[in-house]
Amino acid sequence: MENVCGWIAQAGSAPQGARLSSAQKADWLVIGAGITGLSAAHTLAALHPQARIIVVDRQRAAQGASARNSGFVVAHEHPAHSELIGEPGFAGFEVDTAISRAASDEVRQRIARHAIDCDFRDSGYYFAVNDRAKLDHVDAKLATLRALGARAEFLQGAALAQKLGTRHYQAAIWCGQGNALLQPAKYVKGLLNALPGSITLYEDTDISGLERLSHGRLRANSVDGSIEAKQVLVCLNAFVPRVGIADTATFPMELSASLTRPLTEQEFQAIGAVEPWGVLSTRPLGATVRLTPDRRVMIRNTAEYRTRDLSNGELTLRRQHHVRGLQRRFPFLGESDIQYTWTGHLSASRSGQAYFDRVEEGVFAVAGCNGSGVARGTLWGRLLAELASGIDSPLLQSVMHRAEPGWLPPRPLFDIGAMLRMRVEAVRARTEI
């Protein structure tokens, strides 16, 4: 089957950018034209209006992982037991929430500044479960979320079904005041289209490595060209190692999702003509589900650590998993109702924290979105550009202080451990797919 992202297909085509085919020089080079890289490029252009800035991507700009995620703008995450008020992890959770709220605000500011039409809905979303046991300590979670500025409500049974149009979910915490939904491909395409004319973009340009030249500048090499720059920002998240930065303590995960055709008017009325919504599971491998403004259902219920990308045949099997998840929620939907199925990647870490650092003189990198790439990627791009420009702030200090992704064992031990952990989590989440 064909791997086609429904978000990208709906965002519409864009003119093909040039491919690097010569030696170029720049003041700034940004590697990666996703949310983080484009946010960084916008910030650099504002801070250094006379500088020459080049952005490169190994594929079409704004069509990588940033366009393929589920479109959740995360300001408030579901707190673990150790992060509740009165528990040892609350102080760290409080700092992380302040960062996430700033990131959510950054998304809103970008959308307003560049007039990006991306189906943005500032309506919150749900942490919902089929198995009531997987949503515990409800009162403490509500108190924790509210103490950190969220609006949070507990729903169950008929009241929840009335909101979602399905009786699959038995209990949920709705969380707003910063949490939002958008169409990710439209958002990142909007960032791309708003780049100032002073920025040069090269697409389909795979940077294979960085080398330090004798006079201190850096050269990024591709098959048919090179770019010499004073400063380099590496915004590749899961794929930072491709340019030779190996020690980020982060790792890639491959996810798959499907998007249905729009519901018919009869189907829409049958589920109660509900407002668009988004659901995140309380389990790491539980399903992420959305009902979009154009009445489609999106489901993402596979996440894997792999040493190679899924083949089309393997994606067909994942699509069957999507079908089972759809039919648990909306029995009238089957495989023939799926219009798009695709894969995407995220960058994860053992601790859930990012890698955000000055790698060496003139080289700055970020990785480890841990599933919150829309908001955090937007903020990280700005802060990475500010760090590289010598601009400090309390927010930047908070991000750098929390940027401890944790130690990973060497391969192949890590490969074995990660795959076993994924299997265990899949079993734990079996009621939530």
Language-model region placement:
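Helical element adjacent to the flavin cofactor pocket in flavoenzyme catalytic cores
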Residues: 136, 143-144, 171-230
